[in-house]
Amino acid sequence: MTRSLGKGPFVANHLLKEIEILNFGGSEEVVVTWSRASTIVPVMIGHTIAIHNGREHLPIYITDRMVGHKLGEFAPTRTFRGHARNDKKSRR
């Protein structure tokens, strides 16, 4: 089920305040956040946001094509190590 249009997108207040301060000051800093559920809004374009993946913060540069997506979509939480090999040695 999608979010109601009357509510608008969810963006964590602390994240939005930090982006507004950076836009007003004009500085280029990496914004660190744990809020993977926040929606990317046009105000964030051009900033680098470090998104937590459960172990570390991954720096992600926000572009205009990312608007409307969630921050967590760009920081994968699982590492794929490959499928099991299909030979005689690995079966033992």
Swiss-Prot record:
PANTHER family: RIBOSOMAL PROTEIN S19P FAMILY MEMBER, SMALL RIBOSOMAL SUBUNIT PROTEIN US19M. It is found in: Plastid. Its main location: plastid. The keyword ATP-binding does not apply. Belongs to the universal ribosomal protein uS19 family. It comes from Aneura mirabilis. Protein S19 forms a complex with S13 that binds strongly to the 16S ribosomal RNA. GO terms for molecular function: rRNA binding; structural constituent of ribosome. InterPro entries: Ribosomal_uS19 (IPR002222), Ribosomal_uS19_bac-type (IPR005732), Ribosomal_uS19_CS (IPR020934), Ribosomal_uS19_SF (IPR023575). One of its GO terms (cellular component) is plastid. This is Small ribosomal subunit protein uS19c. NCBIfam families: rpsS_bact. GO terms for biological process: ribosomal small subunit assembly; translation. Pfam families: Ribosomal_S19.
